[in-house]
């Protein structure tokens, strides 16, 4: 009976891994396509399309943004809604429920955010580009799990769960950073209205309201309020996800609003929204000049060293110390080699790093440098991480 309950709790994690690992492969393909187009004769058409303005609504009740902004500010709100639901699910029923389970991935995620941010800040100290310190903090779970699924087919489930939990905590950290540090001038009226709507979502949850359309309407209204408030509108997606009804046990969870939304939106986010985001944001011109410029550019150096080196030091270092001090223990059948391989894969920033870079820089040259370096660092992390998992013999090795 105990094992049955345990498996029920683990199943959402393993299903999530299946979706995200498959999505990572699609994401890689879309990023490559975008880079090829941006470096071909179709580059002008590509840029014209993503910068074409689309207006939704009528007169005073309308929103007008470029296709790129509709993707980054609109579609990505759905991606963040899925992230919010995942975080809530894992806090209530999953690997983030108890301190014992949480301490290792949470500490690893914090280490994996702090060290890269410090490295970036050292390269860009006392320069305007220091605003990009949040870029190397992120881990792209789809890419990381995609690589792991390709080269680590015999990897223990514990390392999959560890990497997934770490990435979820990492996403939560990125959300907090975006909300606090990447916010423009605040419109307090819009923000207060948004918070009132969020309280209404919480109240509907407490009253056990199960009408999905009510939550959809609340979610759209919340997004509009945050769009007008100056706080990045994707935060509305997170708040909606955290506020949805989830149930008190696994049986109630299976019929909850959150479960129904997650069931529909997770594949939509993984296989449509994130690939569209990759197509719209990965189209950068790469040539000898841009690559040589990236070698000496403080933005590029901060991001590359932050993601490729900082993530390894932060994730593996924090985990190793906790295990050595016996504050935490490694998951079943997971060794220090698995842990190090996962730490390297944590340096695949991509989606969230690209997203934060678009918030950090308005100047095209700095943004291009950031995008090039994110791709370089992600390729290095993916290749090195894949090599580690490829050569590991998955046996019962001595724990750290």
Curated annotation (Swiss-Prot):
GO terms for cellular component: plasma membrane. The lineage of its organism: Bacteria, Bacillati, Bacillota, Clostridia, Eubacteriales. It is a multi-pass membrane protein. Gene3D superfamilies: Na+/H+ antiporter like domain. One of its GO terms (biological process) is regulation of pH. This is Na(+)/H(+) antiporter NhaA 1. The gene is nhaA1. The keyword Transmembrane applies. Belongs to the NhaA Na(+)/H(+) (TC 2.A.33) antiporter family. It comes from Clostridium beijerinckii (strain ATCC 51743 / NCIMB 8052). Pfam families: Na_H_antiport_1.
